[in-house]
Amino acid sequence: MMRHRVKRMMLMTTACISLLLGSAPLYAQANDVQQKLAALEKSSGGRLGVALIDTADNAQTLYRADERFAMCSTSKVMAAAAVLKQSETQKKVLSQKVEIKSSDLINYNPITEKHVNGTMTLAELSAAALQYSDNTAMNKLIAHLGGPDKVTAFARAIGDNTFRLDRTEPTLNTAIPGDPRDTTTPLAMAQTLRNLTLGSALGETQRAQLVTWLKGNTTGAASIQAGLPTSWVVGDKTGSGDYGTTNDIAVIWPEGRAPLILVTYFTQPEQKAESRRDVLAAAAKIVTDGY
């Protein structure tokens, strides 16, 4: 009896050792990524948040992923998605025309400024907000929805309990350290972006439209995309604000595999600090190396 017990214990020990040895390379790889992100953060002098979700197996790479960061213009994805959600039941909402006045223009209006004293449809405003980061377009979307709290309500309705939009453009970009207004976490945003673009938060037609808009973004070449192989397809939304806040959220289609969801948020201690898209590109390269 004792001989059998000792043999069984030896087999269990051998199995445990084999399991540990088998997982050691994965652990070392994950630890290496964390160390590289920490080194990047330290060298950049700011605070970095990263969340990567591999939709093939739901594996996650996280760095400060549960800390709050100012969203800045990455919040435009939620506003546009809320309008798309309306279009599931209000078939003509995207073609609804909105008047553009000179008094509507604020600090960045590359598309809406061309339509002063005219109109734009909600579809055109959504495209302007997502693909050119037009701030007046964002405000028009928010106004149509009924205010920032309605954008937050949409987030709650699709299962995001972290996102909060409190203000309109341009004040939502103040990004004051410790200010919870207009913030989310990298992980929450990654999960929501996945739900909106690859999941069931939107109908098939609306989901396809959102993906098309994101793939047509004109502002992201120097951010996440710059850290990826040129053959990969990217749909993203950038954002920037005070304290050198520099953000990008993306759906990524590597060649021959399931999509990746990547959120990179970065902010700095000085209010007048310059944007650091290079930090986002470096973070993207670190976490996607090996895919």
From Swiss-Prot:
The active site is at S73. The class A beta-lactamase family has a specific amino-acid numbering system, sometimes called Ambler or ABL numbering and often misspelt as Amber. A multiple sequence alignment was used to derive a consensus sequence and then the consensus was numbered taking into account insertions and deletions. This allows use of identical numbers, e.g. for active site residues, despite differences in protein length. UniProt always uses natural numbering of residues, hence there appear to be differences in numbering between this entry and some papers. Keywords: Antibiotic resistance, Hydrolase, Plasmid, Secreted, Signal. It is found in: Secreted. GO terms for biological process: beta-lactam antibiotic catabolic process; response to antibiotic. Residues 1-30 form the signal peptide. Inhibited by the beta-lactamase-blocking agents clavulanic acid, tazobactam and sulbactam; in the DH5alpha strain of E.coli. Belongs to the class-A beta-lactamase family. It is an enzyme of class 3 (hydrolase). GO terms for molecular function: beta-lactamase activity. This is Beta-lactamase CTX-M-8. Gene3D superfamilies: DD-peptidase/beta-lactamase superfamily. A beta-lactam binds at K76, S133, E169, S240. Disulfide bonds: none annotated. Its EC number is 3.5.2.6. GO terms for cellular component: extracellular region. It holds the Pfam family Beta-lactamase2. Extended-spectrum beta-lactamase (ESBL) which confers resistance to penicillins, as well as first, third and fourth-generation cephalosporins. Has cefotaxime-hydrolyzing activity. Inactive against cephalosporin antibiotic, cefoxitin, and the carbapenem, imipenem. It comes from the Bacteria. SUPFAM superfamilies: beta-lactamase/transpeptidase-like. Monomer.
